[in-house]
Amino acid sequence: MATVSMRDMLKAGVHFGHQTRYWNPKMKPFIFGARNKVHIINLEKTVPMFNEALAELNKISARKGKILFVGTKRAASEAVKEAANSCDQFFVNHRWLGGMLTNWKTVRQSIKRLKDLETQSQDGTFDKLTKKEALMRTRELDKLENSLGGIKDMGGLPDALFVIDADHEHIAIKEANNLGIPVFAIVDTNSDPDGVDFVIPGNDDAIRAVSLYLGAVAATVREGRSQDLASQAEESFVEAE
């Protein structure tokens, strides 16, 4: 199963927290000290906590669980999309719309509208419209794709959230908490770990660190899914006998 070593984390700068004046005292147990007024995260805590989170995500994906990757700030946006796509999972990488989980019924209607517009753009319907109407629909399609494209095939609520930057994505975490969906999150020294089921203390800004987390999670999810496919194949083989 995918694991991450301390050497990997040091190379990626996972240990660099935020400036000491921005700290959240709830993160004190995970802080090693400070250097040049920047908090240093204790990787002896982070390594086992991240690997424990990976093991749990592996189990969830082996049960066909759906994992929603959330990272809407610029540093994470593209990497979040790539990681989710690489393991056939789902993502929100632009703005988190309030109610995305807690008001799923309404979100589902918007997803239906998105899919209808996609069909219209491909089957020639747009060509039959006036230029103005076609432009309006194209804009609506782009807007919906931007906010819902990563979850349009999710088909229901996710079984877990993997979040880059607990502070930035606090609304998503709160919604998941309200619905009892487990939250796995990268929590920097300026963030509140409350509401996060699997806290991963680490830098949430450095692109190398963000890529390290996402790469490891995507790999562990792919492994979990292949275990699930292997057990399905085994079952059908037994039935055939």
Swiss-Prot record:
It comes from the Bacteria. The keyword Ribonucleoprotein applies. This is Small ribosomal subunit protein uS2. Keywords: Ribonucleoprotein, Ribosomal protein. It comes from Klebsiella pneumoniae (strain 342). Disulfide bonds: none annotated. The lineage of its organism: Bacteria, Pseudomonadati, Pseudomonadota, Gammaproteobacteria, Enterobacterales. One of its GO terms (molecular function) is structural constituent of ribosome. It holds the Pfam family Ribosomal_S2. The keyword Ribosomal protein applies. GO terms for biological process: translation. GO terms for cellular component: cytosolic small ribosomal subunit. Belongs to the universal ribosomal protein uS2 family. HAMAP family: Ribosomal_uS2_B. InterPro entries: Ribosomal_uS2, Ribosomal_uS2_bac/mit/plastid, Ribosomal_uS2_CS, Ribosomal_uS2_flav_dom_sf. NCBIfam families: rpsB_bact.
